[in-house]
Amino acid sequence: MLPRPLRLLWDASPPGGVVLSSFRSRDPEEGGGPGGRGVGGGQEEEEEEEEDEAPVSVWDEEEDGATFTVTSRQYRPLDPLAPTPPPRSSRRLRAGTLEALVRHLLDARTSGADVTFTPAFLATHRAFTSTPALLGLVADRLEALESHPTDELERTIGVATSVLSTWLASHPEDFGSEVKGQLDRLESFLLRTGYAAGEGVGGGSADLIRNLRFRVDPQAPDLPKPLALPGDPPADPTDVLVFLADHLAEQLTLLDAELFLHLVPSQCLGSLWGHRDRPGHSHLCPSVRATVTQFNKVAGAVVSSVLGATSAGEGPGEVTIRPLRPPQRARLLEKWIRVAEECRLLRNFSSVYAVVSALQSSPIHRLRAAWGEATRDSLRVFSSLCQIFSEEDNYSQSRELLLQEVKLQPSLESNSKKAPRSGSGSRGGGVVPYLGTFLKDLVMLDAASKDELENGYINFDKRRKEFAVLSELRRLQNECRGYDLRPDPDIQQWLRGLRPLTEAQSHRVSCEVEPPGTSDPPAPRVLRPTLVVSQWTEVLGSVGGPTPLVSWDRPSVGGEEVPGTPAPLLTRLAQHMKWPSVSSLDSALESTPYLHSLADPSHLSPPASSPRPSRGHRRSASCGSPLSGGAEGASKGTEYRGGGSGPGASDCRIIRVQMELGEDGSVYKSILVTSQDKAPSVISRVLKKNNRDSAVASEYELVQLLPGERELTIPPSANVFYAMDGASHDFLLRQRRRPSTATLGLTSSPSASGTPPSEGGGGSFPRIKATGRKIARALF
C-alpha cells in the first residue's frame, strides 16, 4: 500500500510516471464526489479515454446459414511497458435463414454476447413466420440434440425453457389453440428424455408445460368491449354541452388508457398493420383496430355534434339534422376545444389529436360563420394544439413533447394547476400516446428496408429497428398504468349511444348548413366600445315614456345615455342577447323561440321571475355584433343571472336534483338548466330521467336545498335559472304538499321569508318599478 501523500500526488504525476498498485474509495464529502476527484475516479476516467481512443474494426462473418457482424476493439494498456492484451470482439447476428435464427436463439452464448437478439426475435417473429412453425423448429432442434452428449442437451433444454418462459410472459397472446399440436410434441420429448419432472432443468420444464397448457386450453376470448350496444338508443351529439369539459376528458382518457394497455405491440408491425386491408386479413391486429376505432369514434362525435346531425344508417338521407345557428355551433366548437385542452392536461394525446383532427376536417373547417363566432381565447388554444400535432419534421413537436411528459411526469402532476376532484378521485400520472405516430414509423420502416437479403437470408437488422419502436410502446404502456380515474355511467352511456356520420354524410350536411359560396371569409375582429351601466336607475331614469329607449350599441356621451328608436333597439338587443346553448333546446325544437330570428320582437320575452338588480349594481356590456366579435360579446356581454352570478357564470347551470323513490330510496340526477327553462319543463325532465311519467309533473314541486337546512320552493311559473339561489345547486323533487304553494320563500329563515327575492333592491323605488313594468309591457 502506498503512503497517503504519494496516493494524493498520483494525479499530478506525468503520464506513465507512477504505476498504481492499489486504491481505496473515498467519501464524497471528502472530495471524492463531483467536486473533487478521487484516485479510483481518475483511473476510471483515464480508462474511458483509452476506450474511446481504441481503434475499432468491423467486418462480416458467415457461418451455417447466418451472417454475423463482428466488432473488434484493440485497447492500449495504461502501462506502456505492459504487454498488449488481445482484442475484444463481439458478434451480432445480422441476417440468416429461419433455421439459423432458431439455432442462435437456443445457443447458450447468445444471452451474453447478443443481449437484444432474444427479445427482438420474440417480438417480431410474426413478420417472417408463425408461432406454430417456430415452435416446430424449436422441437426439431431439441430432437436433433437427443443423441448428443448429456451436458450439451441439458444446457440447450435449459436455454429453451428460459426462452419459452420469457416468450409466455411477454407475449401470451401468441399461445392460442393453434399451437396445441406443437405443445404436445414438446411435452412428449421432455417426457421421453426425462426432463419433464424432477428438480433443476426438469422442474422448470414441468412448470413451463403446465403454464403453457393453462394458456392454450380453450377459454373465453379477450375481445374489446363494444362501443355501442345494440339496445342503446341513439344519443344526441349536441348533449356534449351537458357535461363538464374536464369530466368528459377524464372519461375519454379512461377509455383510451384501457385500450392502450390491452394493445399488443407486435400487432403494430408494418408487415401486419400495413396489410390489414388485404383479403383474408380482417382478423389481424384486433387490439390496434380497437384503438383506431375509438379514435375515429371521438373524431366522429366532434363532427356530429358541431353539425348537429345524427346518423340513422349509411344512406345519404338517413340523417337527422338539428337546426343550429352559427353562434350555437361556435359554443360547440369552444366546448370541444376545452375538452381537448383538458385531455392535454391529462397527457391523453390520442383524444387531443382526435378532437383536433376532427375540427380540422373539411366538413368543420369550412364552417366560416361558426368559426367567426368563436372567442379569441378558444381560437388561440386551438392554434396551440394544432402546432403540437403539426406534421412538420415527421411530428417532431409531438414526439419531443411526449418525451418531456414522460420524463417530467411526477413533477408535472404535483405542480398541476388542476386539483383532483372529489367526484373522480386523483387523476394519477399516466400517459396515452397517439398511436398513429408509431404505426407510421413501423410502416415506413417496413417499406424502407427489405425483408430478405439478396441471398434469401432474413434481414434481422430490420427487425432490431422495429423492436426499438415496439420497446418504446412497451415503456409507454407501463407509464399508462399511472392513471386513477373512475367511470361515469352517464358520459359513457352517451358515448356508446353516439352514431357518427359517414364521410359522405358529413360533407353533405356541412354543405346544407353553409352552402358553398355563401360564406364570406371571417372579417377581422374589431374592438367595439364598451358601455358601462353604473346604476340601474340611470337606465330607467332616462326613459320618459313608453317610446324613448336606451341605445345599447353606442358609448355613453358625457355620462348620459343617448336615446334611440324602438326598432333599432330591438335589433341591437337581438345582437347582444346571449345565444342559447344547444342543450337548452329540448325535444320540441319547433316551439323554441331561438330557432327563429332573434331580431323578431315576438320572440324576445323577459324571464318570468327575473330578480331585479340592486341600486348599486354595475354591469359592462361588450358591444360587438354577432358577425364580428359576437362570440366575445356573448361570453362577456350583458346577461341577467339569477342567484348571485359570479365570475365565469353563463346562461346555463348544472343542478343536482334528488327524487324520493319510496322504498327504493332516493337518487340524484344531474340536469342542465338554461335561462329559458321554467319549473314545469325541469320537473318533466327529472321525471323522465327517473323513468317516471312526465304527464304528472303538475303534482310535483321543485325545492332548492340551501345551507343551514333551509329550503327555497320554486313557483310553478318561475324561471328556475333566475329564481334559484347561487349558493347551492342541490334540489329536491317531491310531491306537492299544498296546491297554494306558489310563493317564493325561504322556509327556515324568518328574516328571509319576510321579503321575497323578487323585491330585491327595488322595494324602495315603487315609481321605478312601475316605470319598468310599463317599459316591458310596451316593448314585449
Swiss-Prot record:
Residues 596-613, 741-758 have a biased composition (Low complexity). Keywords: Guanine-nucleotide releasing factor, Phosphoprotein. PROSITE patterns: RA, RASGEF, RASGEF_CAT, RASGEF_NTER. Residues 31-42 have a biased composition (Gly residues). Residues 43-65 have a biased composition (Acidic residues). Residues 1-92, 596-651, 741-769 are annotated as: Disordered. Residues 244-516 form the Ras-GEF domain. Residues 651-738 form the Ras-associating domain. Residues 89-213 form the N-terminal Ras-GEF domain. The modification Phosphoserine is found at S13. GO terms for biological process: small GTPase-mediated signal transduction. GO terms for molecular function: guanyl-nucleotide exchange factor activity. Interacts with SAMD9. Probable guanine nucleotide exchange factor. Putative effector of Ras and/or Rap. Associates with the GTP-bound form of Rap 1A and H-Ras in vitro. This is Ral guanine nucleotide dissociation stimulator-like 2. It comes from Canis lupus familiaris (Dog).
